[in-house]
Amino acid sequence: MLPTAVLLVLAVSVAARDNATCDGPCGLRFRQKLESGMRVVGGMSAEPGAWPWMVSLQIFMYHNNRRYHTCGGILLNSHWVLTAAHCFKNKKKVTDWRLIFGANEVVWGSNKPVKPPLQERFVEEIIIHEKYVSGLEINDIALIKITPPVPCGPFIGPGCLPQFKAGPPRAPQTCWVTGWGYLKEKGPRTSPTLQEARVALIDLELCNSTRWYNGRIRSTNVCAGYPRGKIDTCQGDSGGPLMCRDRAENTFVVVGITSWGVGCARAKRPGVYTSTWPYLNWIASKIGSNALQMVQLGTPPRPSTPAPPVRPPSVQTPVRPPWYFQRPPGPSQQPGSRPRPPAPPPAPPPPPPPPPPPPPPPPPPPQQVSAKPPQALSFAKRLQQLIEALKGTAFSSGRSYYETETTDLQELPAS
């Protein structure tokens, strides 16, 4: 019983840690009520926590310290929000913006701090796609860096992005849009409550036909709505998500970012979205490939990161024995093992001994040969001196052996 309780505590702590750092599963709804939204324009109010990755981008006015909702965004992790580039046409300074997380209702022109579980954050950096074309809304995508990082919780969680192998979203498919935008085309202001609605993906060729958008749709766009209109995103929904359910994972994947449209909910004028799939590499180049893989469904892409980490162990296999590093002699042995090429330095000492012996042998023989005659002569002379001493004609006793060897050499033949 005790081990089970311990395991439950550990599981809860791990889940809480992942939730706090936004490293947990992406695309999970905390409050699911999919049958509610049958009709943004034509939508219905969402339940609190239904879309935890929804972010409210609000312009901050310094003259009255009030915030005004302007665009939506998608939370990717504690540091990054994905949105549309055209949201920053008029306000490009980071100090002009505030980010509200976990909200279901937003107050237009509020000057009060948000209350938990909502979180308010500043903008550290705005990254607009380098090839964004205003007016034509080409490459209408941007990233916002959050400061300080926002923790995830019951009403705040990361959204999912498609896998690289997924390809662009294809019709027919029913997906979802959300936002605090206008409830009708010429509404007075944005909706105070988050709206949700079902929309159908529309084939790009049909959407680009002469009676629809007549060539204005690009391959990096997604069209969603209905031929008859009536349900659509509108002003104030820009930057928000177009989400399709992944039935295998039972999660939602953000396949598009609300970009533009002609009017709101008009017939044959569906909402136009920036497809997220063509920009996965761009997103990875800004937030990092590991951060991107954390918000991509499925295991195939994630093992691609463990695979490189496996290579480092393989690189370390030559020094795999741990004691090489843990013991002091170990490190010295390994550096010494590389100096095995310096083992020739010990070899050079052996070569010196052989050369010295050869030179000494040749010199000594000639020296010994030349020295023998003087030694023979000295011995003969000594013998002669001994004989002469016996005869009574001895040398003075004060001379050394060296002096005797160097004097009277001519007397040698007399012996």
UniProtKB/Swiss-Prot annotation:
Residues 339-415 form a propeptide. GO terms for molecular function: amidase activity; D-mannose binding; fucose binding; serine-type endopeptidase activity; serine-type peptidase activity. It holds the Pfam family Trypsin. Residues 300-312, 328-367 have a biased composition (Pro residues). Residues 395-409 have a biased composition (Polar residues). It is an enzyme of class 3 (hydrolase). Residues 296-376, 395-415 are annotated as: Disordered. Acrosin is the major protease of mammalian spermatozoa. It is a serine protease of trypsin-like cleavage specificity, it is synthesized in a zymogen form, proacrosin and stored in the acrosome. Belongs to the peptidase S1 family. This is Acrosin. The gene is ACR.
